[in-house]
Amino acid sequence: LHHGHINLIARAREYGDITIGLLTDEAVANHKRLPYLNWEQRKKIVENISGVTNVVAQEDWDYAPNLSKYKPDFMAHGSDWLQGPLAAYREKAIQALTEYGGELIEIPYTEGVSSSTISKDLQSIGTTPDIRRATLKRLLSAKPILRFIETHNPISGLIAEHVNIEKDDIKKEFDGFWSSSLTDSTLKGKPD
C-alpha cells in the first residue's frame, strides 16, 4: 500500500461507498513475489482506510468474477492498466461492467511510486533466517508447486533471484534458492 493507492481511494470516495477487491496471497504469488504482509494483515490495513466500507478477496487478477458477483455501480482503477499486461484485464472488466450497466472510472496514475519499487527497496535492506523461514511457510500455503534452484556462488544466486519469464500474462520466477556449504567450500578449493 502506498500513497498512489490512497490517492485512488480518495478519488473513488467521491462516487460512494468503497469495496476493495484485495488480491489474495495466491493471486499475487502467481504473478510476482509473495507480498511482505499476508492477506489478513493487508485486509486489516485496507479496511481501516477512511472511506473503505468493505474488503473482499480477489482470487485472480481478472476483475470480472468479482464485478459479476458484487455488481458495483462504479469501478475505479488507476490509469496504469491502459497498456501492458494489465490491458487484457481492463477489457474483461469493461465487458463485465457493460453486462449489468456498471461504469468504469479511470483515475490518473500517481507517478513516481509503485508496489514493485517498494518491494525492491525492502529486498535491498536484507533478511534474516526467521523471515526466510516464515516466507517459505507462507509460500507452501499459497502455491501448489514452488520453484527452487541450487546456486553454486553469489553470481548464480543473483541470477536466480532476478531471472523471470512472462507467459500468458503470468510472471514466472524462482520462489527461492539454496547453496550448500559443501558446494561453497569445494568451489574455494577447501572441501569439508
Language-model segment annotations:
Residues 118, 126-166:
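N-terminal amphipathic alpha-helix/helix-capping segment at the start of soluble metabolic enzymes
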Residues 25-28, 154-156, 182-187:
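Short active-site-proximal "capping" loops at secondary-structure junctions
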Residues 20, 147-153, 175-180:
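Hydrophobic faces of well-ordered beta-strands that scaffold small-molecule active sites
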Residues 168-192:
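Glycine-rich, proline-tolerant flexible connector loops at the mouths of alpha/beta enzymes
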Residues 1-131:
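Nucleotidyltransferase catalytic core that binds NTPs
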